[in-house]
Every structure is written in C-alpha cells, then in structure tokens.
Amino acid sequence: MDYLVKAIAYDGKVRAYAANTTETIHEAQRRHNTWPTASAALGRTMTAAVMLGAMLKGEDKLTVKIEGGGPIGAIVADGNAKGDVRGYVSNPHVHFDLNEHGKLDVRRAVGTSGTLSVVKDLGLRDLFTGQVEIVSGEIGEDFTYYLVSSEQVPSSVGVGVLVNPDNTILAAGGFILQLLPGTDDETITKLETNLSQVEPISKLIQKGLTPEEVLAAVLGEEPEVLETVPVRFTCNCSKERFARGIIGLGKDEIQQMIDEDGQAEAQCHFCNETYLFTKEELEALRDEI
C-alpha cells in the first residue's frame, strides 16, 4: 500500500516528507494510458503534489499545474491533506529515447520555457496562488525552486518514476527536506553531502526501501516520524457533478444536444471516467431549468 510519512530530524531543525507512490502512479498510468516519458512526468508531478498536500491541514487542498512548452502540454495534479491525489497530462502519448544519463527524458517532454503554479484552497475567501518560472523541466528541481522562491523555505525535492518495458510502473516515490529557521551550517553541510551521494529516489523505492528508510538514507540519520498517511489515486467526479455542468449550459444548448445526438457524453480529465446521459436524462435536466 502506498503511503507517506511526515517527520523531523536533526533535533527539529529539518522537516521531512517521503512517499511511496508506486501503486498510485500505476493507477494513473492505467487510466490515462500514458507512454513511459509521459508516465514519468505525470508521476513525478503527482508525487510532489501529494507531499505538498501533506503540508496542508483538514479539508485544505491544492492544484499543481506545470506548463513548460514541451510536447506533453500541461501537467495538472490535485492533492490534499488526506493523501488523495489525481492528475493528468494534456498529451499522454509522449515518449523519447533515454537521455545522456540513461534516464527517461522528462525535460524534453515537459519543456523548459514556462511556469509551475500551485493554487491552494485553504477554505478562505481567496485562493493562495504561487507561481515560478520552470528552471529545469525535470520537475524535482522545479518544485525545489518553487518552495525556495514562492514559499521562502530552503528545501530539497526528489521525485522519481521507473517504468517497466510493458509501460506499467516499477517504482515511484519522492521526498522533500526543509530547513527550519536557525538550522546551523554543520547540519546544512551534512545534508548537502548526503544528498549528493544518495541513490536516486526511484532506485531506493525499487530496492524496497520504505518511506521511513528513504528518509534515513537521504537525511543520514533516523528521522522522528510524526505521522503516516495512506496515499491513493482518488477522483471526486460524479455523474451528478457533470449533470450540474450540463444544466449550466442552458435550455437551448441542452435541446441542441437532444436534437442532434439524442444523448451526451462527458469525460473527466483527471480519471478518464466517462458518463453517458440518455435522451430522457437530458430532457429531465432541461426541464429542471
């Protein structure tokens, strides 16, 4: 089962998050039929979104959107404080040969000219929006830059996805380390040294390391785990929600659907679920107006 952990380390000077998202990203790949490079880009983004969501409280939620100008188009992911995450890419059928490091060429798929935005719904009247320029297109580095620039928290983000030859997901996961105010230079140096030597997060997950063990590896010491949260692909779409959207089109538009097609089909971007509305259902919706 996928899950994430929230922890502290170095006598409370470092806040840390780590997640195994393998099953969750496998479900996203299955629903969207993403090709390997698109799977890696979507998986990295969803993993980051679920860890950012873990920083929220209660019913708070967020939406991440990456638009880098590459062939994959936009990558969108929703996360919340409960470990729910969902996501999609504009063009799921993108794949390139491995890059010079022998890894999936996510940068080429995402592009390097555009923005990463995070919109938080904290239950207040206004939404909180943070936006930064994309700095690498590799996604982990872009989220690091977002946290440092937009939220002013010195951070390190690692996200990774390994894809099997048959397109299924072999391993997926990530970590976020954040320095709290007053962190001393010795701790910073130790973390930097450790991060430069540790294996990629996807390799650690593939080897069977738990999120707790991943944090111990990247931190260089055992973390104090504060909370464990299950992670899962969850979509809150429903036929009722789409019905409300159809009603919002107005009587004339609904009548046109009835006259031209005798039915209507609505598809959720996030989970690819399709909802069919029969002629009788459309007439009932029309008559509600």
Curated annotation (Swiss-Prot):
Disulfide bonds join 235-237, 268-271. Under oxidizing conditions two disulfide bonds are formed involving the reactive cysteines. Under reducing conditions zinc is bound to the reactive cysteines and the protein is inactive. The keyword Zinc applies. It comes from Bacillus licheniformis (strain ATCC 14580 / DSM 13 / JCM 2505 / CCUG 7422 / NBRC 12200 / NCIMB 9375 / NCTC 10341 / NRRL NRS-1264 / Gibson 46). NCBIfam families: PRK00114.1. CDD domains: Hsp33. Pfam families: HSP33. Belongs to the HSP33 family. This is 33 kDa chaperonin. Keywords: Chaperone, Cytoplasm, Disulfide bond, Redox-active center, Zinc. Redox regulated molecular chaperone. Protects both thermally unfolding and oxidatively damaged proteins from irreversible aggregation. Plays an important role in the bacterial defense system toward oxidative stress. It comes from the Bacteria. One of its GO terms (molecular function) is protein folding chaperone. Its main location: cytoplasm. It is found in: Cytoplasm. The gene is hslO. The keyword Zinc applies. GO terms for biological process: protein refolding. GO terms for cellular component: cytoplasm. PANTHER family: 33 KDA CHAPERONIN. HAMAP family: HslO (MF_00117).
